[in-house]
Amino acid sequence: MSTGQPAHNTGVADDPEVVRRALLTRGWYRFGYDSTLADWVSAVIPHARAIADDPAARHAWLRCGGTWFAGVNILPNAPDGSLPAIGDRPAVPPLQGRAIRFLRETMGHGALPLDRAQLSICYPGYPAAPQPDESEAAFRYRRNRDAAHVDGLERDAARNRRLGEAHAFILAIPVAEAGPEAAPFTIWEGSHEIMRTAFRTRLTGLPREAWSQQDVTAAYTTARREAFESCRRVTLSAAPGEAYIAHRLSLHGVAPWEATAGPGAWRPIVYFRPELPALPDGTPDFEAWLSLP
């Protein structure tokens, strides 16, 4: 619907009820500066730099012609977000602040353990080139549609999409200054409800234990097309000490790094995407994934 507009909050001092309404309506919220979170970021920066400079990590995770370090679950944090001191890198305290407190207290995630965080880094020129296994059409989608996706979907051997992981939320924490045109996070407002309806319609009437085996490709691509046509695309950027959350069902991606973005050398973001508590048999709780606010 829109080619992209910078995001603006309407809440005052991140009031929990204002944040909740925004998250459930728009599918995102950006928190203002938080000194407690800023302290966590300051401690984690040396760890992020060490990971980004590690040759083995770069070999494993550098993508798109050297302009994207994917870094999935690469930060060795404990379930509370803390890290021990490693060499000359300081210990990182447990993750605290308004954003994680909102998710725990207002959204009901309580003591849900955090996953090992993703360290996603974009560099000038992203995306410079396709990945080795990326088709021309897929690369065009990356450039023109921000590689927009819903987290938790997986592809099987036939490249069909299935439910794979039941995330609770997406919490994004920038760890360095970067301009708003330096490969910002993008999200289609309200797309989470389009996706919820699409997946619910596709899976209604099927036993819960069969949900993860269903091909949801057609439902997903149709819902994605609807979101592109009817939802406002907004760009989200934030400074260290700020954070933003995205609804787990939202359609989101990363915009290209614009030539006007300025001289910044990197755009690193730490993402926490913990999974909802599993069912007694250890499988993901996709019913909760679809039903929770």
Positions of the model-derived regions?
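Fe(II)/2-oxoglutarate
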Residues: 1-43
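Generic recognition of flexible, low-complexity loop/linker segments
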Residues: 17-19, 158-160, 232-234, 255-258
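Non-heme Fe(II) oxygenase catalytic core, chiefly the N-lobe of the double-stranded beta-helix
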Residues: 23-26, 39-233
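Intrinsic-disorder/low-complexity, polar/charged segments enriched in Ser/Thr/Lys/Arg/Asp/Glu/Gln
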Residues: 30, 168-170, 233, 243, ...
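Active-site donor-binding loop signature of nucleotide-sugar glycosyltransferases
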Residues: 33, 190, 272-274
